[in-house]
Amino acid sequence: MPIKIPDNLPAKEILTKENIFVMAESRAYSQDIRPLKIVILNLMPIKQTTETQLLRLLGNTPLQVEVSFMYTDTHISKNTSYDHLQTFYQTIDEVKQKKFDGMIITGAPIETLPYDEVDYWNELKQIMEWSKTNVTSTLHICWGAQAGLFYHYGVEKVPLPEKQFGVYPHKINVPNVKLLRGFDDEFYVPHSRHTDINKAQIEAHPDLEILSESEQAGVYIVASKDGKQIFVTGHSEYDACTLQQEYERDRARGLNIQVPENYFPNDDATRKPLLRWRAHSYLLFSNWLNYYVYQETPYDLSR
């Protein structure tokens, strides 16, 4: 089934070329189906790239999904135009009276900053508090996962001696959990971060469960026992070339960056990267939409 997005969203053309089933708003209005209402709080600097990555995954399920975008009004974006934000995005003040079936909170390249030094931290706390009553299930990604774990459960982030950068094998900790239904015993996920989360604090919390982790990359997926809060520390949504672009960007800046692990064949950065996380990324988002959103949300969101 399709994703429903604004007719003139730039990501629409890219997704259509990839044969992702995109339905324009004008056509969707003629169908007598209630789509799942998903709101994406996009904290990434280059918002159009993240839009395309997430819409690609949301559009690969049997469910019709209507996507809205949010941004933080207390932060001035340097990499996304004001016109784009005004055309396609809303603030918490504009959506706070609405309810959504699901929400995605993206990462942001600010994990080394203390939370109270993030210029939109107070607004983000307001959004996360609002989500507890206005969203059926929220999926947090990378820094969004760290921020969510800290806000909701007091789990601290911890600095890493060097950047966790590469594609790593992961295992399933909790057999038969719905979020990982259909996953192989071992699967790969990209990571790109300077901080980790305190595993001991997660294990000590009665409302949290570590669903998946990696010997090299640490905790990967944490979920609340009721499924309303999902925290994913990696970047399953990344394109094949995203880590390569980050590596080349940091090298151009003169940073001491290592070649992403398990990414280029024989760690040779001149060769085409290996894409080996696509199937599991589609499955992760499909399972979340099906088991944690669609099967849990009321038909009438006003209830």
Swiss-Prot record:
Protein residues bound to substrate: 163, 192, 249
Positions annotated as active site in the UniProt record: 142 (acyl-thioester intermediate), 235 (proton acceptor), 237
Reactions listed under catalytic activity: L-homoserine + acetyl-CoA = O-acetyl-L-homoserine + CoA
EC assignment: 2.3.1.31
Compartment(s) of residence: Cytoplasm
Listed Gene3D superfamilies: 3.40.50.880
One Gene Ontology biological process: L-methionine biosynthetic process from homoserine via O-succinyl-L-homoserine and cystathionine
Pfam family, one: HTS
CC annotations in GO: cytoplasm
Domain of life: Bacteria
Keyword set, alphabetical order: Acyltransferase, Amino-acid biosynthesis, Cytoplasm, Methionine biosynthesis, Transferase
Family: Belongs to the MetA family.
Cited PANTHER family: HOMOSERINE O-SUCCINYLTRANSFERASE
Record protein name field: Homoserine O-acetyltransferase
Origin species: Halalkalibacterium halodurans (strain ATCC BAA-125 / DSM 18197 / FERM 7344 / JCM 9153 / C-125) (Bacillus halodurans)
Lineage summary: Bacteria, Bacillati, Bacillota, Bacilli, Bacillales
